[in-house]
From Swiss-Prot:
It comes from Yarrowia lipolytica (strain CLIB 122 / E 150) (Yeast). Transmembrane segments: none annotated. Residues 214-223 have a biased composition (Basic and acidic residues). This is NADH-ubiquinone oxidoreductase assembly factor N7BML. Its main location: mitochondrion.
């Protein structure tokens, strides 16, 4: 971590004139009732940051930046991220020049380390066909092939044999109506059949109806029923 430097010189002396700095210092005094705009601070490029009262919300000030060179477009001005956080009210206190200088030194040190590492990697000679690794000469298919010995393969085979294999689920059994006995089909015959409504001699007739039911079940087994539309019922209105 880079320590916060102690300023022994003014880093913005060549960017902001002295009379303007005195004027901004006076504008930074906030205990004067007739002022509506207050100076807050500078960045290392000389841009000034201000606060002024919000007419729509008196309890919250508005924050703006005034570029040091108004002739340039706002896109050409590089605002430090610390001041961007302050402008967006994600930072309670504004950054100081010491903090900005410390962050600039950190970036310069990081760039110097990156340049040193890049120079170090450039000194390492590239691998040629003579000193290349064996893995580089192998194709991708050969590199992806597993390299197991015969003993390892035999051990894995024994492990797989000990693992219980789950049997495949049996398909749903569809009853074959032709192979079902007549008594089994008659069990499903409706109980409220002709036995309950017929008189003498109805038992033989009931048996005939049951046999017709058996033949019908055998013929219609597994066949979808045909759709027979019903006549619409006319409503009386």
């Amino acid at each position: 971590m880079i320590p916060t430097p102690v300023l022994r010189f003014n880093p913005i002396a060549d960017k902001v004139p002295k009379w303007k700095r005195i004027y901004h210092k006076w504008r930074g005094i906030q205990n004067m009732p007739f002022k509506s705009k207050y100076f807050v601070g500078y960045d290392l490029d000389g841009n000034s940051y201000w606060e002024f009262k919000n007419v729509n919300n008196p309890g919250r000030y508005r924050r703006i930046v005034e570029p040091a060179k108004p002739d340039l477009s706002l896109v050409d001005h590089k605002i430090p991220p610390q001041w961007v956080q302050w402008l967006r009210f994600t930072r309670p206190h504004h950054p100081t020049l010491e903090e900005l200088i410390a962050d600039k030194q950190r970036q310069e040190l990081l760039q110097a380390k990156i340049a040193a590492y890049e120079a170090k990697w450039k000194e390492i000679p590239l691998k040629t066909a003579e000193n290349a690794d064996e893995s580089r000469d192998m194709s991708l298919e050969d590199q992806l092939k597993p390299t197991f010995t015969e003993a390892e393969l035999a051990e894995m085979a024994q492990v797989f044999e000990k693992v219980p294999q789950q049997a495949a689920p049996a398909p749903p059994r569809v009853p074959n109506m032709a192979a079902i006995e007549v008594e089994d089909i008659i069990k499903h015959y409706p109980e409220n059949g002709p036995d309950t409504v017929l008189a003498d001699g109805g038992r033989q007739r009931d048996h005939d109806l049951k046999m017709d039911y058996v033949e019908k079940e055998r013929d219609d087994s597994g066949k979808p029923a045909e759709w027979t539309p019903k006549a619409a019922v006319r409503r009386r209105g």
